[in-house]
Amino acid sequence: MLKFAIAVALLLFIGLELREARDGYPQSKVNYCKIYCPNTTVCQWTCKNRAGATDGDCRWSSCYCFNVAPDTVLYGDPGTKPCMA
């Protein structure tokens, strides 16, 4: 039981802190959207509504945003995974 408690505490300490994207959906502080990217249309909608970007592309089931709005603060560079605003 003690090992389980330590493991949970460690996971919480490492990075399960949640923030919110523009649409209020929780996001991880490690910059990954909590969505699966089935196609480019879904990715482009996600980029527009979460990162303020005008374009997006699915790559290896992950959504990447491009042309991010200049006033959007990102934890990475344009062309990285969305939900970083």
Swiss-Prot record:
Disulphide-bridged cysteine pairs: 33-83, 37-58, 43-63, 47-65
Q: Where located?
A: Secreted
**Tissue specificity:** Expressed by the venom gland.
Q: Name one GO cellular component term.
A: extracellular region
According to the entry, every stretch annotated as the LCN-type CS-alpha/beta domain falls at 22-84
Q: Which domain of life is it from?
A: Eukaryota
Signal peptide segment? 1-21
- Which keywords does this chain's UniProt record carry? Disulfide bond, Ion channel impairing toxin, Neurotoxin, Secreted, Signal, Toxin, Voltage-gated sodium channel impairing toxin
Gene3D superfamilies reported in the protein's UniProt record: Knottin, scorpion toxin-like
For this protein, the record's SUPFAM superfamilies field holds: Scorpion toxin-like
For this chain, one GO molecular function annotation is: ion channel inhibitor activity
Which family would the database say this protein is a member of? Belongs to the long (4 C-C) scorpion toxin superfamily. Sodium channel inhibitor family. Beta subfamily.
Quote the entry's note on domains. Answer: Has the structural arrangement of an alpha-helix connected to antiparallel beta-sheets by disulfide bonds (CS-alpha/beta).
Stated role: Alpha toxins bind voltage-independently at site-3 of sodium channels (Nav) and inhibit the inactivation of the activated channels, thereby blocking neuronal transmission. This toxin binds, in vitro, to sodium channels and inhibits the inactivation of the activated channels. Seems not toxic to mice, crickets and sweet-water shrimps.
- What name is this protein filed under? Toxin TdNa9
